[in-house]
């Protein structure tokens, strides 16, 4: 196998040097590989469970810290617990509910919470008078026509089936 090498071709245009001198900036140029990278600094959260606290369904003062106003179990992110602690707390809460130490849901607070949430989302409600008598009359007359046509069709079917 013989591979022919082609000669290096020179370009016909001459190489132009830049007339502006190259100035190095005082700050080094930083090239970020991932611009929105999350910082990986170690963090230590203080647990809401003390070293002497027993996670048990009878320890109501401890359990009540990990339940929301509506009676729901709060998430690990909110509780700032380890996985093992969260599992034990969840089991204790469920046992307390079954043994009727805790309600399954706190309906009084839940109703208040829902009312507040709805008012925040929708804002104040203003009723507008949108009643236009001409349009409602037109709509009702169309509805009456449709109903009468439907009745006629049903009568025709009944007559044809009788024969």
Swiss-Prot record:
The keyword Cell division does not apply. GO terms for biological process: translation. Keywords: Chloroplast, Plastid, Ribonucleoprotein, Ribosomal protein, RNA-binding, rRNA-binding. Residues 7-48 have a biased composition (Basic residues). Its main location: plastid. The keyword RNA-binding applies. Residues 1-52, 144-163 are annotated as: Disordered. Pfam families: Ribosomal_S18. GO terms for cellular component: chloroplast; mitochondrial small ribosomal subunit. It is found in: Plastid, Chloroplast. GO terms for molecular function: small ribosomal subunit rRNA binding; structural constituent of ribosome. Part of the 30S ribosomal subunit. Belongs to the bacterial ribosomal protein bS18 family. NCBIfam families: S18 (TIGR00165). This is Small ribosomal subunit protein bS18c. The lineage of its organism: Eukaryota, Viridiplantae, Streptophyta, Embryophyta, Tracheophyta.
